[in-house]
From Swiss-Prot:
The gene is sbcB. The keyword Ubl conjugation does not apply. It catalyses: Exonucleolytic cleavage in the 3'- to 5'-direction to yield nucleoside 5'-phosphates. GO terms for molecular function: 5'-deoxyribose-5-phosphate lyase activity; magnesium ion binding; single-stranded DNA 3'-5' DNA exonuclease activity; single-stranded DNA binding. This is Exodeoxyribonuclease I. The N-terminal exonuclease domain and the exonuclease C-terminal domain form a central positively charged groove which binds the DNA. It comes from the Bacteria. The record marks R148 as: Important for interaction with ssb. GO terms for biological process: DNA catabolic process; DNA repair. The keyword Nuclease applies. The record marks R113, Y124, W128, R142, K214, N257, N299, Y365, F368 as: Interaction with single-stranded DNA. Its cofactor is Mg(2+).
Length: 481
């Protein structure tokens, strides 16, 4: 679909700043978003929300230094994560919204899913329901650099490799980006990069807009013909110009979102010899990945294009060994046994190992909630702030575990005796003497490292005091309820 014909569509550019890098374990500190029409005219005003962390969490000191956002600041000007999640969910669930970030597919979207999961909101519907979709400007910019670099300034690192950092790209192209690692500033910069690409490369912009959804991407893929397509990804690295020719060979028999393909830049004969010699019982994922088997997640907006997009001058510029690709393709087509062997191997291996530990925050990807489970989750929202009276034992056990943590974090007065005991034990594990010593030593080392940097020292001292305050406040909240 031509983007100009979709007049009801809006873009929502967004960004998080966080207290750490792990989407399941770390917490958000700031969210910002701007909504625009398809011509990048801003609708309404920028939305900015700060979020203070729950008491069972230690912010990463280095992340605080990067963003300049301290937990003290968020406690003064922010909301708790439950209120934070509800506000974001209401923005994301507006129909016909394309939700866009910069490296959001692998970072911000993962934080979104986990934030919604912890707070009884659907982790996935926001990105596909009611005509919604998602898109990543970093991947689009990378595709632009690989395919049609003319007209955009490409900054360089010290080793002369291209830099796709948001701050560097913005500076090189006269895009205002006042404060790096500030969500509001990053959002404006991301929007203007999208605008730049659409102005300079309208055909490329429209092509990848059309093929941003799983449904559209599937039309580019034929696993039966063994015809190659071009794949552009950070996976290949700047050394390989982020590009390779791949051959789709089959759909993963367990996860239908995974396209199993062969990388034609690798030694295909080695792959064939390996599967001829080895029983599937002696094969593992690491080995096949190193040899050139590629898993492409079609629900993550991969950059896939027909081979005819690559012109002769592109092959020369990108130093593509086209003869190698052709020879490997001939080999593959002569050895159709590989497809059967791969399928048998993939069927013999269970799904990716599920997390079986006690921390429910890490269990989002263990499985989808059922339709019945999702109805229970909706009921939790509708009955709050009263305590819902449901026999959680009848449902997915994660719901009960999440609910106990939810009450402990936001309504500790509602905990019964056994739940309170669980909460205290969890807290004592996180804030054990050894953990606190290690954490405080890390802060002290950073204070020494940045002793001449007033801002950093102030942030670290605030963090030191915050930990003391949190420990004191936790004990108070438990023993006064």
């Amino acid at each position: 679909m031509d983007i100009q014909k979709n007049t009801s569509l809006t873009f929502l550019f967004y960004d998080y700043e966080t207290f750490g890098k792990n989407p399941a374990l770390d917490k958000p500190s700031q969210f910002s978003c701007i909504q625009t029409d398809i011509d990048f005219n801003i609708i309404g005003s920028i939305q900015e929300i700060f979020c203070y962390p729950s008491v069972d969490y230690l912010p990463d000191p280095e992340s605080v230094l990067i963003t300049g956002i301290s937990p003290k600041y968020t406690s003064l000007f922010g909301v708790n994560e439950f209120e934070f999640a509800k506000k974001i969910y209401s923005l994301f669930m507006k129909s016909d919204t394309c939700i866009i970030g910069y490296n959001n597919i692998y970072f911000d979207d993962e934080f979104t899913r986990n934030i919604f999961y912890r707070n009884f909101l659907n982790s996935y519907e926001w990105s596909w329901k009611n005509g919604n979709s998602r898109w990543d400007m970093l991947d689009l910019l990378r595709a632009c650099y690989v395919l049609r670099p003319e007209g955009i300034n490409w900054p360089r690192n010290e080793d002369n490799s291209v830099s796709l950092r948001l701050s560097d790209i913005s500076l090189a192209n006269n895009i205002v980006h006042n404060v790096a690692h500030n969500a509001s500033s990053d959002v404006y910069a991301t929007m203007n990069i999208a605008k730049l690409i659409k102005q300079k490369k309208p055909k490329l912009f429209n092509f990848f807009f059309k093929y941003r959804t799983k449904k559209a991407i599937l039309t580019l893929i034929d696993v039966n013909s063994l015809n190659p397509i071009v794949y552009i990804s950070r996976f290949f690295g700047v050394v390989n110009r982020y590009i390779s020719y791949i051959v789709p060979i089959l759909w993963h028999p367990i996860n239908s979102n995974i396209l199993v393909s062969i990388d034609l830049s690798q030694d295909v004969q080695k792959i064939l010899n390996f599967f001829k010699r080895n029983s599937i019982l002696n094969v593992n994922y690491k080995e096949i990945f190193l040899m050139g088997i590629r898993f492409i997640y079609v629900n993550r907006c991969p950059i896939l294009i027909p081979t005819n997009v690559i012109r002769m001058k592109d092959r020369i510029r990108l130093r593509i060994n086209y003869k190698l690709f052709q020879n490997n393709l001939v080999l593959l087509r002569k050895n159709i046994f590989l497809k059967k062997k791969l399928k048998k191997f993939l069927c013999s291996i269970a799904e990716a190992p599920k997390y079986n530990g006690s921390n429910v925050d890490l269990k989002m990807y263990n499985s989808f909630f059922s339709y019945i489970d999702n109805n229970v989750i909706k009921n939790i929202h509708s009955t709050l702030p009263k305590r819902i009276k449901i026999n959680f034992m009848k449902y997915d056990n994660r719901i009960n575990q999440l609910f106990i943590l939810f009450l402990a974090r936001y309504r500790p007065d509602m905990l019964d005796y056994s739940e309170k005991y669980f909460w205290i034990q969890r807290y004592l594990n996180i804030f054990s003497y050894a953990n606190i010593q290690k954490y405080e030593n890390k802060i002290l080392k950073l204070i020494v490292k940045y002793k001449n940097h007033v801002r950093n020292v102030q942030l670290l001292e605030e963090l030191f005091e915050y930990v003391k305050y949190t420990r004191k406040n936790f004990l108070k909240s438990i023993f006064t309820n």
